Amino acid sequence: MKQLTFALALLLLYISFPTSLPAAKVEVEGKAWLDAQKDPPEMNVNGVWDSEEWGDFHLTQADGSRDVSGNGGGYHIMGVVSGKRLFMLFFANHTVDYCATLSPNGENSLAGNYSNRKSRLHSGLCQESSRPMNMKKR
């Protein structure tokens, strides 16, 4: 009876802590987050940007397009411009690691926040708590 109780306790413990849940994928949760930003673009972020927090960003946005792609801070970048806001996902190996939202802050400057992705045990894409992020166009 003790062995059965011990085995059941281990099974419950194993089920309670699902460590193999997938992290947010850029093609699924990331795309859904970006698609939810629906305003037409009112700015273009194409070019090289410098961020104290992340280093250089090389962003590409075609004229009239909302879609943004590029790289920076050791990550691939996928994003959209919605109105006067830039929404970016930082990802590696198809997994979202950070989310950022930035708005114009003077000429050739963007300011906003970035946050870590949520842990594998929580639903959603990125955490509520965030840190400041600033970018200046070169």
Predicted regions and their residues:
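Amphipathic/hydrophobic helical signal segments and adjacent flexible N-terminal regions
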Residues: 2-48, 52-54, 113, 122-138
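Central antiparallel beta-sheet cores of small beta-barrel/beta-sandwich binding domains
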Residues: 30-106, 111-118
